[in-house]
């Protein structure tokens, strides 16, 4: 540990930067909290908030996503080799096979089995360091009816507004 409180090796300080997209205050706050904790253990971690994310040039990034309506919605794009939202260039043949087979079936039991295979493969070879699940708190007047609290899964889940067209107000 150096005099500045950070580890070095061969004269080079152990350091990295977490990039976070601008306009995502919740993720900016999470990145800043993580950086503070990482600095406390001797790694010089900083946060940058670029106007435009350079997906090929960052050291680390804090992102989030969800598949609120169907597991295939974002999962295939995020974890499939060479897919559009696979920003980390993750590649795993078992993950690709499970995701491809799951999206080719309309049988819920078959899809569930393939998504279980996907989760096992991803757990054995993680694409990311998953650090949290962002949840949400909502408050509404008791005069509003139709909100189903069981579907509230944060801003990436189904969300509170999934059935807004059926809500009524006394």
Model-identified regions with their sequence ranges:
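Append "and occasionally in soluble cytosolic enzymes with long acidic Gly/Pro-rich linkers
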Residues: 1-35, 117, 169
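Loop/turn elements at helix/coil->beta-strand transitions in domains of secreted/extracellular proteins
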Residues: 13-15, 40-44, 57-59, 125-128
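Detector for C-terminal structural segments
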Residues: 26-35, 54-170
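Long, His/Glu/Asp-enriched segments that create or flank divalent metal/ion-associated functional microenvironments
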Residues: 29-50
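Cofactor-binding loop segments of dinucleotide-utilizing enzymes, especially the Rossmann-like FAD-
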Residues: 21, 50, 65
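Surface-exposed patches in mature extracellular/periplasmic domains of secreted proteins
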Residues: 4-7, 46-50, 110, 114, ...
């Amino acid at each position: 540990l150096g005099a500045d409180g950070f580890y070095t090796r061969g004269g080079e300080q152990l350091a990295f930067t977490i990039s976070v997209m601008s306009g995502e205050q919740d993720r900016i706050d999470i990145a800043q909290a993580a950086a503070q904790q990482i600095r406390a253990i001797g790694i010089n971690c900083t946060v940058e908030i670029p106007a435009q994310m350079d997906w090929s040039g960052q050291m680390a990034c804090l992102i989030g996503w969800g598949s609120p309506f169907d597991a295939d919605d974002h999962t295939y794009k995020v974890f499939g080799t060479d897919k559009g939202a696979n920003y980390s260039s993750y590649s795993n043949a078992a993950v690709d096979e499970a995701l491809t087979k799951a999206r080719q079936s309309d049988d819920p039991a078959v899809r569930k089995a393939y998504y279980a295979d996907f989760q096992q493969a991803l757990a054995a070879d993680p694409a990311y360091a998953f650090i949290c699940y962002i949840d949400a708190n909502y408050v509404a007047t008791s005069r509003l009816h139709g909100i189903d609290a069981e579907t509230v899964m944060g801003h990436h889940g189904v969300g509170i507004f999934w059935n807004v067209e059926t809500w009524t107000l006394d």
